[in-house]
Amino acid sequence: QQQTLAGLDTLNVLCIDNDAPYVYQKDGEPAGMLIAILDDFAERTELNLSYTFCEDRTQAREYLTNGSYDMRIGAPLTSGTCAELGFINSAPVIQSVLAYVQNPTSSGSGTIAVMSGIEELINTEGYDNTLIFDNTNECIQAVESKKADLAAGDRSVMEYYIYDNGSTLVTSLIPGQTQNVSIAVSRETDATLLAVLNNYIYSISEADLAGYLSRGNLHSDSFSLLLFTRRHPAQAILSKIVVMAVLALVNFLPANRAAKQRVAMQEQHNTQLKEALQIAREA
């Protein structure tokens, strides 16, 4: 792979922010599943990466018009839109399920919010109005403010921002609807890059993929615990009591086992001593 990409040195990667757990910024640094995969890919191929972040798809088009980028990640593109922008999608990193997000206090179903770029994946025929937003977080906020009755998009992304916002929205799967999460590679970049990248993606095991996704979700993992505590204080207190009891039991069992071992050893020693004294008397 290093020899194949010998003509390349630095890859310029355009990242669309607010697409956690796949692509986002954490404390000003690139983060997310796709970032982690590209970092490891660059390390293996001895390439350098230069990440540039933009806010949404609209701004991404401006960046692509005014600059040159080898890759584009975040807010996955369908093959048609990808080709229109002069890119080719890599092999799917993962296939993510699509879902609805709904406010449990809302009884309406006339307006649906959808992220720009995936409209063709969502059947909106049964709704009176369709609102198009630049990112998933804006779709969620539209449902929270009741501008929309529900939103549709990538389940992992929506659940990340539901946790992140401390929201009470609920998700439900859209049966049979999925989207590929891929890395878009520019047609102007050396064609061998796409082939080598695809080979690398195919080589990633299911366990490693789960690890990459987990790294992308680190922010929401701690928040989900906070969210559970906030929403269910009584259960949280009970859970804490149970955990403390389990820890006490775990600490007690080894100590109790060690004490029993000491008693057994002492009894064995006493038995051996009695036998030795008995032998001495008989002699």
What are these regions (language model features)?
Residues A42-L47, T65, Y69, E144-A148, ...:
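Sec-exported extracytoplasmic/periplasmic mature domains
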Residues Q1-G80, L121-I122, D128-F133, Q141:
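Extracytoplasmic small-molecule ligand-binding "clamshell" domains
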Residues K26-M33, T52, D56, P92, ...:
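Extracytoplasmic/periplasmic, Sec-exported soluble proteins
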Residues A91-P104, G108-Q177, I183:
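Membrane-proximal low-complexity regions enriched in glycine and acidic/polar residues
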Residues I35, D39, E43-R44, S50-S109, ...:
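Acidic, polar ligand-binding/catalytic clefts
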Residues L225-L273:
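Alpha-helical transmembrane signal-anchor helices
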Residues Q278-A283:
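Conserved HAMP-HisKA connector
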Residues Q1, G32-R44, S106-E120, T124, ...:
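Extended ligand-binding regions for polar small-molecule ligands
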